[in-house]
Amino acid sequence: MAAPHRPGLRISSGLTIPEAELSWRFSRSSGPGGQGVNTADSRVELLWDAAGSSALTPHQRERILDRLGGRLVNGVLTIAASEHRAQLRNRDAARERLASLVAEALRP
């Protein structure tokens, strides 16, 4: 289970995205899930402003904007997760996806 207090999203030993730079949106998820699927906001969207991030060096920012340019809208990367019935699990899945995507984009 995830820790309730997170100082940030660790991408690598040299890069952690501060929690304050991560924004969340919640909505109802579609698909199976029983009665709760229509009443619980279990779908999550994690937004991170890569273009304006204070965590990145200029080189890292340039590489991310170049490699993830097709996924960015006005410099903001959005990750959606709705595969789990619980919002907390979807939040964790979105965080893991963001970390993986950014780490892959920063690889030489």
What feature does the model see in each segment?
Residues 1-108:
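Ribosome-associated translation termination/rescue signal centered on the conserved GGQ peptidyl-tRNA hydrolysis loop
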